[in-house]
């Protein structure tokens, strides 16, 4: 038998697929988005950009921007009673009202 892969993208076939009209690299504006501390944002992974990509388990999670680390943003949210922080590039985040 073969061994199961254990890479960071394993088990993410449905999460990281893009529709035909959205394939390819994102626009420059998408990569240069800015957020303020306190803004609400959702994690929407763009599979064309591997830099600053959060783990695919966090796809669709909504949280609050709490700061920056380099050119990436720190997104805080709760899972049950546990406070979690994810570092993600702006291309993988979408503003939420």
Curated annotation (Swiss-Prot):
Example GO biological process: translation
InterPro entries: Ribosomal_eL21, Ribosomal_eL21_arc, Ribosomal_eL21_sf, Translation_prot_SH3-like_sf
GO terms under cellular component: ribonucleoprotein complex; ribosome
Molecular function GO labels: structural constituent of ribosome
Keywords: Ribonucleoprotein, Ribosomal protein
Gene3D superfamilies registered for this protein in UniProt: Ribosomal protein L21
Ribosomal protein in keyword set: yes
SUPFAM superfamilies: Translation proteins SH3-like domain
Span list, region Disordered: 1-23
Record flagged with keyword Iron: no
Similarity annotation: Belongs to the eukaryotic ribosomal protein eL21 family.
Protein name: Large ribosomal subunit protein eL21
Naturally occurring in which organism (per UniProt): Picrophilus torridus (strain ATCC 700027 / DSM 9790 / JCM 10055 / NBRC 100828 / KAW 2/3)
